[in-house]
């Protein structure tokens, strides 16, 4: 192999110049923004359908400003486009960070990226299709003849976005636990021993992450977190078992 060929393939342990990193980051950001913009425009025709679907538990929305309905549509289209473009965005993130990784690290990072998206999508879907409708119906039941709900479309969508995003994040718990166990910073025995303390922390976290102040929404978030915590213990035991088998 001649010198030119060797120079065209830098070694993995050679540092990548800062300007090259910045150029690559700029390129990946542009690709991500283009993907989000394209997906936002593509899903815009479905915005009215989603608004009608969201309105089922409440009947009808109101808007209190001349531009509220207009901007709400664009806001919803953006978040729908962001979710639809998430695989592309995650691929761009992966393409950027994989340049400095060894082959074994690339494989692990690729798996983490895919699992992270699947868990976030599961949490977001769980919130949108189950938690939000049930929670809203429960909260509206506290109305009366002298307390009639008049729900602003922008405030309602902010509530839904908060719930969906929060549930997407908390569903990452098994992955976070597995990552800490993999690094040797956590053990399954510790997780089992500290279960009672973890339950208290989970309810505090649910209260902090839930957009609404009501206890019902907080409990709805805490229950899946408890299940995910137990799933994290199982993941931790699997990682420890594999580590022992590999010596």
Report the location of each language-model feature:
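Membrane topogenic/interface segments and analogous intrinsically disordered interaction regions
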Residues: 1-247
């Amino acid at each position: 192999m001649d010198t030119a060929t060797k120079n065209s393939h830098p070694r993995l342990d050679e540092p990548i110049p800062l300007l090259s990193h910045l150029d690559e980051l700029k390129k990946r950001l542009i690709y991500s923004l283009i993907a989000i913009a394209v997906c936002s425009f593509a899903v815009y025709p479905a915005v009215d359908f989603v608004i009608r679907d969201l309105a089922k538990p409440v009947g009808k929305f109101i808007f209190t400003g001349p531009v509220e309905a207009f901007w709400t549509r664009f806001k919803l289209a953006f978040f729908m486009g962001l979710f639809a473009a998430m695989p592309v965005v995650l691929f761009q993130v992966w393409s950027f960070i994989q340049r400095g990784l060894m082959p074994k690290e690339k494989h692990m990072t690729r798996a983490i990226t895919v699992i992270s998206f699947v868990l976030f999508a599961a949490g977001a879907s769980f919130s949108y299709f189950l938690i939000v409708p049930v929670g809203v119906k429960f909260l509206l039941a506290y109305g009366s003849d002298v307390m009639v709900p008049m729900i602003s479309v922008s405030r309602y969508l902010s509530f839904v976005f908060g719930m969906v995003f929060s549930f997407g994040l908390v569903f990452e718990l098994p992955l976070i636990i597995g990552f800490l166990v993999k690094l040797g910073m956590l053990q399954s025995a510790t997780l089992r021993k500290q279960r009672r303390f973890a339950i208290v922390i989970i309810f505090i976290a649910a209260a902090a992450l839930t957009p609404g102040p009501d206890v019902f929404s907080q409990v709805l978030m805490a229950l899946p977190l408890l299940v995910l915590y137990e799933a994290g213990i199982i993941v931790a035991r699997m990682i420890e078992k594999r580590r022992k088998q590999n010596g």
